[in-house]
Amino acid sequence: MALSPQLFFALYVSAFALGFPLNLLAIRGAVARARLRLTPNLVYTLHLACSDLLLAITLPVKAVEALASGAWPLPLPLCPVFVLVHFAPLYAGGGFLAALSAGRYLGAAFPFGYQAVRRPRYSWGVCVAIWALVLCHMGLVLGLEAPGGWLNTTSSSLGINTPVNGSPVCLEAWDPNSARPARLSFSILLFFVPLVITAFCYVGCLRALAHSGLSHKRKLRAAWAAGGAFLTLLLCLGPYNASNVASFVNPDLGGSWRKLGLITGSWSVVLNPLVTGYLGASPGRGTVCTTRTQGGTIQK
């Protein structure tokens, strides 16, 4: 299904207009709560919101690029910077959502054991590891696949390429023989692994909630807190990464599906702040996952 450039433009602009202020509010709310008590989930939320803020900043460029039918609108040397700032948060977001889900699952299934070892400094270490994994993998793959450098105008370049119509294109003119395996490796390591972790933790949270003493209403709230990350991964990041797999299996399936996947991925900047639930400016408000077990209560 092919969408018009005007519709792509409108979707990118809408994602930016909603996602940018939402993530600013999420950061504000998380910082306000962290001043009272810093928890592992607050650390993950802050990194996720900052990551989404970076992604949101690039969306106006994607909007102009879409309106120009893929032509690169900025000076040529900014292409590699844009690729890094746009795609690193897109892949890192899955890791932060998986970390949030793991924290909720461990708190629900093993409240006392997890309470004894949950320390914010461990969460900072996890976040640094996620960023390092994403950036190192991107640098390694992109560096190996660009033997002539980012601004080489050959067909194997990852950066600027000049197609037949004479307009410069950033990244999308990447040689398909190099792009397909590279994008597949990104998706397997940085999406499908976090997706499996998130799905496992979601099922574990549901089992723990089923045996908890919470009311039906609070069970629904806790189930949303646990399942929101899984839904965001599926709905926002799933189509883009599915297109990477599809284009590897059948090269003819990649083009328009990938463009749609980038659109849904951009809307993760809108859904993620709603999933984390730290939009309120007041430290005393916000959606938290609270699980009451046989011997006590744990709050994350």
Curated annotation (Swiss-Prot):
CDD domains: 7tmA_FFAR1. InterPro entries: GPCR_Rhodpsn (IPR000276), GPCR_Rhodpsn_7TM (IPR017452), GPR40-rel_orph (IPR013312), GPR40_recept_FA (IPR013313). It holds the Pfam family 7tm_1. GO terms for biological process: glucose homeostasis; insulin secretion; ligand-gated ion channel signaling pathway; negative regulation of interleukin-1 beta production; phospholipase C-activating G protein-coupled receptor signaling pathway; positive regulation of calcium ion transport; positive regulation of cytosolic calcium ion concentration; positive regulation of insulin secretion. The chain crosses the membrane at residues 9-31, 42-64, 80-101, 122-142, 179-200, 224-248, 257-279. The record marks E145, E172 as: Important for receptor activation. One of its GO terms (molecular function) is lipid binding. One of its GO terms (cellular component) is plasma membrane. Residues 1-8, 65-79, 143-178, 249-256 are extracellular. Keywords: Cell membrane, Disulfide bond, G-protein coupled receptor, Glycoprotein, Lipid-binding, Membrane, Receptor, Transducer, Transmembrane, Transmembrane helix. Residues 32-41, 102-121, 201-223, 280-300 are cytoplasmic. Gene3D superfamilies: Rhodopsin 7-helix transmembrane proteins (1.20.1070.10). It is found in: Cell membrane. Glycans are attached at N152. It is a multi-pass membrane protein. Disulfide bonds join C79-C170. G-protein coupled receptor for medium and long chain saturated and unsaturated fatty acids that plays an important role in glucose homeostasis. Fatty acid binding increases glucose-stimulated insulin secretion, and may also enhance the secretion of glucagon-like peptide 1 (GLP-1). May also play a role in bone homeostasis; receptor signaling activates pathways that inhibit osteoclast differentiation. Ligand binding leads to a conformation change that triggers signaling via G-proteins that activate phospholipase C, leading to an increase of the intracellular calcium concentration. Belongs to the G-protein coupled receptor 1 family. This is Free fatty acid receptor 1.
